Design a protein with these regions (language model features):
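Amphipathic alpha-helical repeat scaffolds of TPR domains
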Residues: 1-10, 39, 43-67, 73-82, ...
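Single-residue signature of alpha-solenoid repeat helices
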Residues: 18, 22-25, 72, 119, ...
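Conserved structural position within tetratricopeptide repeats
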Residues: 31-34, 81, 127-128, 160-165
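Mid-chain, structured segments of secreted extracytoplasmic proteins
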Residues: 1-33
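Alpha-solenoid helical repeat scaffolds
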Residues: 23, 27-30, 77, 84, ...
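Extended amphipathic alpha-helical coiled-coil/heptad-repeat regions
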Residues: 142-172
Length: 172
């Protein structure tokens, strides 16, 4: 699949097929990484994952522009989650300057698709980036999710954080 992805990428004629091959490659290499007794294949899988990593962001942007939030979320999630894998903890995968925007998009897309645990994880990741632009909205969304889940202790914690950061806001 990876070779097919590279072929389509180099031709540049069928973008949808290219990203389909990219996601297939990602999923297959992740199966290798997660498989038991994978030591003889792990190096190759890691190299391929490292090579396809920047294209995951491009896939997220592409499907976002195509108004396909579920597919965009798949690519964004892969882009966000891959550097957190144990396999890559000893190295820094380069994060694009759009990283925070992609994390926020993924969080909102997950929220809209009612994938609340994923949404919470990505809203928290956005807060961890230190980017100010959408922080207030992250707290609002997290509050709504915890309220919907009836997790009142978590909701109270988020509201306390939000009020400490935005003491004069009427949103909390």
């Amino acid at each position: 699949q990876y070779v097919l992805f590279e072929s389509e990428r180099d031709k540049g004629t069928n973008v949808t097929a290219m990203y389909d091959y990219l996601m297939d490659s990602y999923e297959n290499f992740m199966k290798v990484v997660e498989a038991p007794d994978n030591s003889q294949y792990i190096g190759g899988a890691k190299n391929r994952l490292r090579a396809l990593y920047p294209y995951l962001l491009n896939g997220a942007v592409y499907y976002s522009e195509q108004k396909q939030p579920s597919k965009a979320l798949d690519f964004a999630a892969a882009y966000i989650d891959m550097p957190q894998l144990k396999l890559f903890r000893s190295e820094l995968l380069p994060k694009d300057n759009r990283y925070a925007s992609v994390v926020y998009y993924a969080a909102v897309a997950a929220f809209n698709l009612e994938k609340n645990e994923k949404a919470l994880r990505y809203f928290q990741e956005y807060l961890n980036t230190g980017t100010e632009a959408q922080q207030k909205d992250c707290y609002v969304y997290m509050n709504m999710i915890y309220q919907k889940q009836k997790k009142y202790a978590d909701q109270e914690r988020v509201l306390e954080q939000a009020i400490a950061k935005y003491p004069v806001s009427l949103d909390f």
